[in-house]
């Protein structure tokens, strides 16, 4: 993929908005578990868990539940081996917030729900995303959104983090 450049969106500011939302929720005594979608969502979740002083967080790898698994092939397998699903909490009856970097079609979230339900039956599942591109193919929406962004269909947002752990989005051309 060819890198086009930085996106107008301030990913770090959007992260802080989501952190504040969860901080307020934690102050009310509301219990929840965080589970990030590999890769970008897991980075966000790891940082949220640290900033909120949470004992643990989960990672969900959707590789084996993707509806385009046949197309992704070895790429999906590499992702699954680099960051496998790990849920260090009881899923049954839990209030779980799924976290991802970008919401576009909803297909990755559908795959994440399938993977999550392989581990149990949560009481509630909410979705938090850093960027919402608003181009659904499935009836899925986020409960918490850092920022809504407009990006041409032939481009993708790629979350990056610097050495200090700060986030930014790069814009790349979609591979055909």
What are these regions (language model features)?
Residues 1-31:
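Active-site-facing substrate-recognition patch
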Residues 2, 114-176:
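PRPP-dependent phosphoribosyltransferase catalytic core
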Residues 31-33, 56, 95, 124-127:
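Residues at the starts of beta-strands that form the adenosine-phosphate
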Residues 35-43:
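Gly/Ser/Thr-rich loops at beta-strand to alpha-helix junctions
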Residues 46-58:
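Substrate-recognition/cap helix-loop segment adjacent to the acidic, metal-dependent catalytic center
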Residues 46-47, 68-72, 137-142:
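Short, well-ordered secondary-structure micro-motifs
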Residues 56-96:
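Short, glycine/charge-rich flexible loops or terminal/linker lids adjacent to PRPP-binding catalytic cores
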Residues 84-117:
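Internal catalytic-core helix/loop-beta-alpha segment
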């Amino acid at each position: 993929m060819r890198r086009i450049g930085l996106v107008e969106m301030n990913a770090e500011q959007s992260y802080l908005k989501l952190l504040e939302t969860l901080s307020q929720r934690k102050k009310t005594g509301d219990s929840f578990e965080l589970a990030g979608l590999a890769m970008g969502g897991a980075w966000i979740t790891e940082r949220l868990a640290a900033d909120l002083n949470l004992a643990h967080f989960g990672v969900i790898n959707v590789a084996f539940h993707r509806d385009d698994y046949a197309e992704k092939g070895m790429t999906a397998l590499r992702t699954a081996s680099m960051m496998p699903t790990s849920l260090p909490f009881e899923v049954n009856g839990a209030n779980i917030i799924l976290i991802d970097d970008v919401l576009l079609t909803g297909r990755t979230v559908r795959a994440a729900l399938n993977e999550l339900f392989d581990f149990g039956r949560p009481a509630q599942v909410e979705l938090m995303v850093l960027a919402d591109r608003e181009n659904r193919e499935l009836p899925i929406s986020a409960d918490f959104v850092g920022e809504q962004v407009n990006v041409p269909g032939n481009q993708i947002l790629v979350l990056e983090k610097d050495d200090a752990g700060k986030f930014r989005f790069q814009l790349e051309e979609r591979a055909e």
